[in-house]
Design a protein with these regions (language model features):
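Active-site acidic/histidine proton-transfer and metal-coordination neighborhood
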Residues: 72-167
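Alpha-helix-loop-beta-strand connector modules within alpha/beta enzyme cores
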Residues: 49-65, 122-133, 161-163, 222-229
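A cross-domain feature marking catalytic cores of carbohydrate-active enzymes
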Residues: 5-9, 32-36, 62-66, 103-105, ...
Length: 261
């Protein structure tokens, strides 16, 4: 796997410092945040990012906006804003030559069968406006709350393939889903999504809350995932809290996992 880290989750907001840390730890990429780009553009200047990429040989991935964004909204103005923000994020990702853009799928706040059909149609329409992106879009598994519209691996696969997209497999999210449903959700996502998974989000938790702890500090059995991780040829982002120390600890932990025979 090609290992990198999320600068915003680790609270390394100085992009130059993020690239220095990635270079020191011999990581492959830094994951940038479109939410941060929108809120504080000076922190994610494309010209500086491209200078850093050229100087270090370190690439980037982009987490497309998720704050106050809902591609499945039943409110036309809210959904239009969400689409436009995502399109601007994809333009930013193209400018910095991101290898992929991670995207959340959408929320449904009305637990009613008629509303569910309308929400599904709204999400399909939103995604249809994104399919011409020059940057691969990786739909992420969520299923953390009752409001997350896409439920489980099969729904995510159907949505992904209908629009010719790819996937980001978040191990922490899958772990929470598996604990809640008392099943092997992580294994199900791996088997069901298969080669559509081009990007990983790696972090840890207790199976109850999405804490984004450094890997090895929760209840995810990373040793059981060692063969999968070693054989994965996409990008794998450490989406961990704890600042630089959390990133360092996670890198050391993952590199200590046994190499399959």
């Amino acid at each position: 796997m090609r290992l990198g880290f999320s600068a915003v989750t680790a609270a390394v907001l100085d992009v130059s410092a993020a690239f220095r840390l990635a270079a020191e730890l011999e990581l492959t990429f830094v994951e940038l945040s479109c939410d941060l780009r929108e809120a504080a553009p000076v922190l994610h200047e494309p010209a500086l990012i491209n200078e850093l990429r050229s100087a270090t040989g370190i690439g980037v991935t982009v987490h497309l906006s998720s704050v106050d964004l809902n591609l499945a909204s039943l409110i036309p103005a809210a959904r239009r804003t969400s689409i436009d923000r995502t399109l601007r994020g994809l333009e930013f990702a193209h400018t910095v030559d991101a290898s992929c853009g991670v995207l959340h799928t959408g929320l449904s706040y009305l637990p009613h069968p008629q509303a569910e059909a309308l929400v599904g149609a709204a999400l399909q329409e939103s995604l249809s406006e994104l399919v011409d992106s020059s940057v691969p879009i990786a739909l992420e598994n969520l299923c953390l709350t009752d409001f997350d519209f896409v439920r489980g691996a099969r729904e995510l696969r159907e949505l992904t393939r209908r629009h010719g997209l790819r996937n980001c497999l978040d191990l922490g999210h899958a772990h929470i889903e598996g604990v809640r449903e008392a099943n092997d959700a992580l294994g199900d996502y791996r088997r069901t999504l298969g080669a559509d998974v081009v990007h990983l989000h790696l972090h840890d938790n207790d199976g109850l809350s999405d804490a984004h702890r450094p890997t090895g500090e929760g209840t995810i059995d990373y040793a059981a995932q060692a063969a999968f991780l070693h054989g994965f040829d996409g990008t794998a982002c450490l989406e961990v809290t704890g600042g630089e120390a959390g990133v360092r600890a996670s890198v050391a932990h993952l590199r200590s996992l046994p190499t399959p025979a």
